């Protein structure tokens, strides 16, 4: 008798919870607001993704002024006015009006530190919980994900939203699966796993299962904008909705940077590296390459300075930055290396305008906004020979070379030496071609392509 009572109680609870959830969704669908909800939990990361957010807000305000723009963020110190100011101060983007802000309390569910193991699936499922919180508080007509949380798309559709995403890179890529299969150690494939046949097999099964789920949820979007040829090729295979996928190059500050003269001071020549202090950005490789270049430098060639410019998101990034500083001391190049943490936009622009070269070290960087910024400013890029930089950016312009591609410490060092040793005429010619190439990725071009992509969705009927 007792077991029946327990079973009845459990079924009653399940029914009550299900009914409550169902009614919440129904009420939310009925109360949808004429607004675009930007799902961007981190509005202070300072990277290219945040620039896309503010340029997208600006584009929608220009294209659809009758729609409110609402930011779903986990940054509780952010307000409408402070975010509008940040868009100007950090990225030079002027919004027509400050966006509305919805503060989220469950952001810990998408933080990497919450999931020491099975991080991808943990963060992905956590994003669903966070999106549930967001959509219950405010349900917009249009749900626009600018942070790559594809697992939120089915939920947003259940809430009656048109789903649009701007995908910087796939959460899982065919390259990641290939590396696990080949047992290559990397920042996202621990050496202990790569060395073990059993663990590699288990991880391969996990990755394949996740890629199937990722494909299912990704296919729920009404429109997917991707930022590069590399990302487009992967998303088309994973999501299998090629007719709903379009490439929109990300916004780069080319207009302001192109105002700088191409001439540079060679006392000393400055080499810049702009990237968040994240493990995949390969700052250590750049430092090692710079040190090697100095060792090989002829006595009659000006000794360059290396400037690291980036933001720190958390304690892990802070520790990574400190290790970089310590390594500079070990290599005895600390006097030749400068660090700029969380630099404001104006300072970043000034540094770019004085650099002769720019370093980029990330393997399979989906696009590479920093590379475009180097080129626009007149700094010759030295980028990793993969993905976005290789396929879209560091290509010849009118038959003229626009920069260098490298993979190893030695290749980066050789490229640094070649630029430092260049005569002024040769350097100016390459810098001019690089700047011309960068014009293809302007903020204005992004806004035009973004508006063209969303127009059929925003003018079509809501289902």
UniProtKB/Swiss-Prot annotation:
Keywords in alphabetical order: Endoplasmic reticulum, Glycosyltransferase, Membrane, Transferase, Transmembrane, Transmembrane helix
Pfam families per the UniProt record, alphabetical: ALG11_N, Glycos_transf_1
Domain of life: Eukaryota
Known catalytic reactions: an alpha-D-Man-(1->3)-[alpha-D-Man-(1->6)]-beta-D-Man-(1->4)-beta-D-GlcNAc-(1->4)-alpha-D-GlcNAc-diphospho-di-trans,poly-cis-dolichol + 2 GDP-alpha-D-mannose = an alpha-D-Man-(1->2)-alpha-D-Man-(1->2)-alpha-D-Man-(1->3)-[alpha-D-Man-(1->6)]-beta-D-Man-(1->4)-beta-D-GlcNAc-(1->4)-alpha-D-GlcNAc-diphospho-di-trans,poly-cis-dolichol + 2 GDP + 2 H(+)
Bilayer disposition of the protein: Single-pass membrane protein
GO biological process: dolichol-linked oligosaccharide biosynthetic process; plant-type cell wall biogenesis; protein N-linked glycosylation; response to abscisic acid; response to osmotic stress
UniProt xrefs under Gene3D superfamilies: Glycogen Phosphorylase B
Lumenal side: 1-6
Tissues with expression: Expressed in shoots, leaves, sepals, filaments, siliques, stems, roots and guard cells.
Broad class of the protein's primary localization: endoplasmic reticulum
Gene Ontology CC annotations of this record: endoplasmic reticulum; endoplasmic reticulum membrane
MF terms (GO), sorted A to Z: GDP-Man:Man3GlcNAc2-PP-Dol alpha-1,2-mannosyltransferase activity
Keyword Transmembrane helix belongs to the record: yes
Consequence of gene disruption: Lethality.
EC number: 2.4.1.131
Subcellular location as annotated: Endoplasmic reticulum membrane
Record keyword Chloroplast present: no
Broad class of enzyme this protein falls into: transferase
Role this protein plays: GDP-Man:Man(3)GlcNAc(2)-PP-Dol alpha-1,2-mannosyltransferase that operates in the biosynthetic pathway of dolichol-linked oligosaccharides, the glycan precursors employed in protein asparagine (N)-glycosylation. The assembly of dolichol-linked oligosaccharides begins on the cytosolic side of the endoplasmic reticulum membrane and finishes in its lumen. The sequential addition of sugars to dolichol pyrophosphate produces dolichol-linked oligosaccharides containing fourteen sugars, including two GlcNAcs, nine mannoses and three glucoses.
Similarity comment text for this entry: Belongs to the glycosyltransferase 4 family.
Extra information: In the absence of ALG11 activity, no N-glycans are produced and transferred to proteins.
Protein's name according to its UniProt entry: GDP-Man:Man(3)GlcNAc(2)-PP-Dol alpha-1,2-mannosyltransferase
Organism in which the protein naturally occurs: Arabidopsis thaliana (Mouse-ear cress)
């Amino acid at each position: 008798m007792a077991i029946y009572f327990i079973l009845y109680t459990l079924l009653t609870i399940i029914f009550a919870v299900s009914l409550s959830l169902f009614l919440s969704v129904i009420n939310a669908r009925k109360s949808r607001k004429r607004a675009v909800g930007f799902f961007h939990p981190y509005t202070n990361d300072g990277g290219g993704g945040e620039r896309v957010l503010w340029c997208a807000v600006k584009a929608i305000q220009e294209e659809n002024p009758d729609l409110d723009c609402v930011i779903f963020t986990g940054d509780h110190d952010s307000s409408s006015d402070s975010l509008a100011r940040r868009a100007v101060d950090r990225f030079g983007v002027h919004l027509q009006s400050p966006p509305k802000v919805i503060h989220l309390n469950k952001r810990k569910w998408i933080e990497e530190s919450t999931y020491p193991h099975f991080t991808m699936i943990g963060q992905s499922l956590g994003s669903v919980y966070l999106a549930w919180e967001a959509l219950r508080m405010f349900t917009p007509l249009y749900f626009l994900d600018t942070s790559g949380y594809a697992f939120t798309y089915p939920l947003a559709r259940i809430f009656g939203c048109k789903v649009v995403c701007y995908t910087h890179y796939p959460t899982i890529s065919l390259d990641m699966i290939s590396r696990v299969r080949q047992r290559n150690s990397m920042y996202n494939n621990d050496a202990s796993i790569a060395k073990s046949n059993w663990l590699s097999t288990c991880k391969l099964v996990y990755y394949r299962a996740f890629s199937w789920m990722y494909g299912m949820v990704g296919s729920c979007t009404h429109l997917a904008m991707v930022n590069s040829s590399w990302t487009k090729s992967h998303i088309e295979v994973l999501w299998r909705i090629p007719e709903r996928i379009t490439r929109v190059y990300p916004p780069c500050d080319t207009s302001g940077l192109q105002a700088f003269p191409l001439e540079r001071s060679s006392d000393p020549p400055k080499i810049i590296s702009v990237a968040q202090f994240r493990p995949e950005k390969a700052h250590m490789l750049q430092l090692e390459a710079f040190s090697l270049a100095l060792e090989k430098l002829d006595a009659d060639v000006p000794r360059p300075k290396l400037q690291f410019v980036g933001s720190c998101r958390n304690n892990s990034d802070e520790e990574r930055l400190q290790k970089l500083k310590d390594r500079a001391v070990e290599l005895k190049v600390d006097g030749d290396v400068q660090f700029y943490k969380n630099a404001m936009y104006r300072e970043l622009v000034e540094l770019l305008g004085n650099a002769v070269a720019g370093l980029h070290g990330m393997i399979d960087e989906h696009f590479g906004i920093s590379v475009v910024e180097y080129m626009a400013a007149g700094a010759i890029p030295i980028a990793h020979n993969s993905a976005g930089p290789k396929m879209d950016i560091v290509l010849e312009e009118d038959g003229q070379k626009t920069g260098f591609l490298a993979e190893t410490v030695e290749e980066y060092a050789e490229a640094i030496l070649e630029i430092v040793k260049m005569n002024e005429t040769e350097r100016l010619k390459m810098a001019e071609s690089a700047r011309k190439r960068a014009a293809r990725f302007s903020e204005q071009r992004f806004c035009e392509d973004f508006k063209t992509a969303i127009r059929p969705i925003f003018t079509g009927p809501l289902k």
